[in-house]
């Protein structure tokens, strides 16, 4: 793939054409040290020009769709690849780049940072009127996406657009690339390129009781903010500061996704996509309850009895070391690492603040049946008393399947993964706090 690898679908007099520039031999119209212009002849008397121009430390990428026919042309889909900073294993890691992007209509932008975190940052912004409205996982970015988005099965939120080009008219779009020295300069450049700098507090995932404050800054005037659900989204304009900063207060009463469309400049738009959840206390309690009710194995015939495992939402079933489902890695249901450790430590933290007898009993069941003397060695097991098997499967480690204690730490001696120790120390400490602070579990402290 190369920069300028563009594809599009357009309609002329009821007939649809889908073309990829990679399949058509172009004509080079200009090739100088600071500029190259390339031309493609497309079906139905349509021409497409791409021009790359170097201006100091900046590069402009201009796309010109020229309708030379006698009939209107409707561009329904236009997409491009962006092979910039893709992971390249043929070079050293520090020479690669990390890509970050905000896909947000006319205010979309991309930037690439060195993997080392040091050095210049490459920023890509939109030319006036250019908008990115959709992207696919395989790296296709859409300027128009009328056919690309499956509105029946896809949950994509941004609207799809098309562009009608009249006879002998040009449709111009494009991008700018520039270098910045740091993240603050990224924001400054976005502002300079007529983008929108957004700051939101406390964040874009909120609960109904939160008041959300939003600051928008742009060289172009903010015309209006339009709520997706006007009766359930309160938008209050607080003030305009220093001419180019606009301050708003939002309040949401509808759970789920809530979109606010920002109209700015001359018919430009971008979006503020919020997600509104139930109150935090409700969420904390619901999550702990689900873990205990749905995600713990209770089968004394299994070596993983007591394990908190992963729940397959699509199939509504609990996965296990005997049944990985669509998982690729055994460690995800083996009892260690983040997928397993996160659940008991969460339930224990929750019960320090909001104690529940059934949930505390679930933690005790986990410790007695899965951890003590199994995942974790007891104080009487030698060598390595109290050692924790931070592995895909402690049962196989203990059995000697992968070796003994002198095998370098891959068999019976695999107890070197430090992260698991901090997790289980936290669980023990939380159980102590529960027993000490909550009268309903005074019997636990005595144990």
PLM features: residue spans?
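Short, hydrophobic/aromatic beta-strand segments
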Residues: 69-79, 185-188, 222-227
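Extended, loop-rich substrate-binding clefts of extracytoplasmic carbohydrate-active enzymes
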Residues: 2-62, 66-70, 147-161, 167, ...
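Catalytic cores of extracellular degradative/oxidative enzymes
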Residues: 287-447
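Beta-strand-rich recognition/accessory modules
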Residues: 39-43, 55, 81-83, 115-204, ...
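Aromatic/hydrophobic beta-strand junction motif of beta-rich domains
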Residues: 206-221
